[in-house]
Amino acid sequence: MTDDKAVPRTDYKLESDSELRFEIENKNEKVTVVLLNGQAELFGTELVVKKPYEFVTGAKVAIFTYHGCTIELRGKPDVAYVAKETPMVMYLNANSALEHLRNKAEQEDAQGPIVMVVGPTDVGKTTLCRIFLNYAVRLGRRPIFVDLDVGQGGIAIPGTIGALLVERPAPVAEGFSQQAPLVYHYGHSTPSANSTFYDVLISKLAETTLERLQANKKAKSSGMIINTCGWVKGSGYSHILHTVEAFEVTAIFVLDQERLYNELLRDVKGTVQVVFLPKSGGVVERTKSQRTEARDQRIREYFYGSKMPLFPHSFDVKFSDIKIFKVGSPPLPDSCLPLGMKAEDNYTKLVAVQPGPQLLHHILAVSFAESTDENVIQTNVAGFICVTNVNMDKQVLTVLSPQPRPLPQTILLVSDLQFMDSH
């Protein structure tokens, strides 16, 4: 045990409208934050006075105060400083405008704002979504959070898109409560891997979430907050326009990039509000290896938990008890296609996969589909397993699963994403 007195402690006195920013990069480093007095929040979640909050390697934190406070840091962050220049007041004003629209929707029994946050990579899109969601639930709203970022999404594991009804603020050092999320398997960490399939899933998720909004009066007036990926040029821009249409978006917040802001002003309907917001100076650019590590960490947390450890199950599944598929096959030239079939149909085709050593370490999504007669690619998933061993002699896969056997369904979808289980 480390002697608590040996841990360095630093007090920071923050004036109103300023924030304490710190980062932890060193392996196995922990930093504890304690609000000694005043009021402060982390991305819209209020801190409780004298309660310790623990952050670990990889954390990039900005604690903001509207009225002033004193914060104690225990531990050795790689960098820690107080910033007086912050866009938080602008973000609060944007949220006030959304709240005005929600009040109006509530009075008229109409649909609340459908909000989309866009911008290139590493400008703070996920953070802004979190701030909007936390502020909304603190005011008694129940918005739906939609995450279309297949590389660094916050609802399920990478390689998926999903939606979640948010009923309480996110805990300070964690994400939103993951009760009953609606998740669709995509199977890649970038939309460019299969653009056609990505658009199909966006349309399906939009259709389902808009129906759910209508079915829940509280959610209906609260609306949606949609997070997007950082691909904003070429096909990436086309995906943004497709999302606007599919979700019937009413407001777009563009972070940091004026070119994207002006393109959207030109291309979306006049009824859609397009608003430019600056990124925070605390936003940190991530390297390719940091992104890969973040994806691994998301998958690890899915099986093993973060603060509260989870204990996944390992068991064998017979080849004969499951059907494994992937979505999409290489496109054929038009001259080779059957009559009436288009080249893009290949991108959304269900292709059978024979169990074998090539599946080792791959993530498999467990589809809710009961047979291939259903539209499997547009059916949401129950959860995920990881293949930890393939025994061709016994014709079994050994899998890591969050719940004990048997698998809830037998149709499994292969993801490009892999996870090396080191436990």
From Swiss-Prot:
Single GO term (MF): ATP binding
A biological process term (GO) from this entry: mRNA 3'-end processing
Role, per record: Required for endonucleolytic cleavage during polyadenylation-dependent pre-mRNA 3'-end formation.
GO cellular component term of the entry, any: mRNA cleavage factor complex
Subcellular location: Nucleus
Pfam families in UniProt: Clp1 (PF06807), CLP1_N (PF16573), CLP1_P (PF16575)
Gene: cbc
Major subcellular site: nucleus
Family of the protein in this entry: Belongs to the Clp1 family. Clp1 subfamily.
Stated name of the protein: Protein CLP1 homolog
Binding site for ATP: 19, 60, 122-127
PANTHER family given in the database record: CLEAVAGE/POLYADENYLATION FACTOR IA SUBUNIT CLP1P, POLYRIBONUCLEOTIDE 5'-HYDROXYL-KINASE CLP1
Alphabetical UniProt keywords: ATP-binding, mRNA processing, Nucleotide-binding, Nucleus
